[in-house]
């Protein structure tokens, strides 16, 4: 089994990650790779913004992130239209069931 190099995750504390086992520990003299976490932090920030937008979508008075101005109440309108369509379809199913 080939030994993967350790990934230094906290240089000030000499903490490294062993990618083969997923264990975090101190560096013991093996080859160490120092990684920049900037790209990962940007992706995490984008994911957090998406998660916040998803949580905010539960409140029908909020505005979706990145939407055009004047879109207040779009979730409320979408919810009403969805319920109207579901009610219409359910009504048709019940009507056909009663007629047959």
UniProtKB/Swiss-Prot annotation:
Which GO cellular component term is one of those annotated? plasma membrane
In short, the EC number is: 7.2.1.4
- The membrane-spanning stretches of this chain are 80-100
Q: Where in the cell is it found?
A: Cell membrane
| Keyword Phosphoprotein on entry | no
Endpoints of the signal sequence: none
What pathway does the UniProt record associate with this protein?
Answer: One-carbon metabolism; methanogenesis from CO(2); methyl-coenzyme M from 5,10-methylene-5,6,7,8-tetrahydromethanopterin: step 2/2
Origin superkingdom: Archaea
Q: How does it sit in the membrane?
A: Single-pass membrane protein
Which GO BP terms, alphabetically? methanogenesis, from carbon dioxide; methylation; one-carbon metabolic process
Q: Name one GO molecular function term.
A: tetrahydromethanopterin S-methyltransferase activity
- Is DNA-binding found in the keyword set? no
Q: Which reaction does it catalyse?
A: 5-methyl-5,6,7,8-tetrahydromethanopterin + coenzyme M + 2 Na(+)(in) = 5,6,7,8-tetrahydromethanopterin + methyl-coenzyme M + 2 Na(+)(out)
Keywords from the named record: Cell membrane, Membrane, Methanogenesis, Methyltransferase, One-carbon metabolism, Transferase, Translocase, Transmembrane, Transmembrane helix
Q: What induces it?
A: Part of the probable mtrEDCBAFGH operon.
Query: Function, please?
Result: Part of a complex that catalyzes the formation of methyl-coenzyme M and tetrahydromethanopterin from coenzyme M and methyl-tetrahydromethanopterin. This is an energy-conserving, sodium-ion translocating step.
The protein's assembly and partners: The complex is composed of 8 subunits; MtrA, MtrB, MtrC, MtrD, MtrE, MtrF, MtrG and MtrH.
Q: Which family does it belong to?
A: Belongs to the MtrB family.
Q: Which HAMAP family match?
A: MtrB (MF_01094)
* Name of the featured protein: Tetrahydromethanopterin S-methyltransferase subunit B
Give the species this sequence originates from: Methanothermobacter marburgensis (strain ATCC BAA-927 / DSM 2133 / JCM 14651 / NBRC 100331 / OCM 82 / Marburg)
């Amino acid at each position: 089994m080939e030994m993967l190099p350790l990934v230094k995750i906290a240089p000030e504390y000499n903490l490294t990650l062993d990618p083969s086992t997923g264990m975090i520990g101190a560096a013991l003299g093996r080859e160490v790779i120092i990684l920049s976490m900037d790209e990962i932090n940007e992706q995490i920030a984008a994911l957090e913004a998406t998660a916040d937008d998803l949580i905010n979508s539960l409140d029908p008075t909020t505005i979706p992130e990145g939407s055009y101005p004047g879109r207040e109440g779009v979730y409320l309108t979408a919810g009403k239209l969805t319920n109207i369509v579901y009610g219409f379809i359910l009504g048709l199913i019940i009507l056909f069931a009663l007629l047959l």
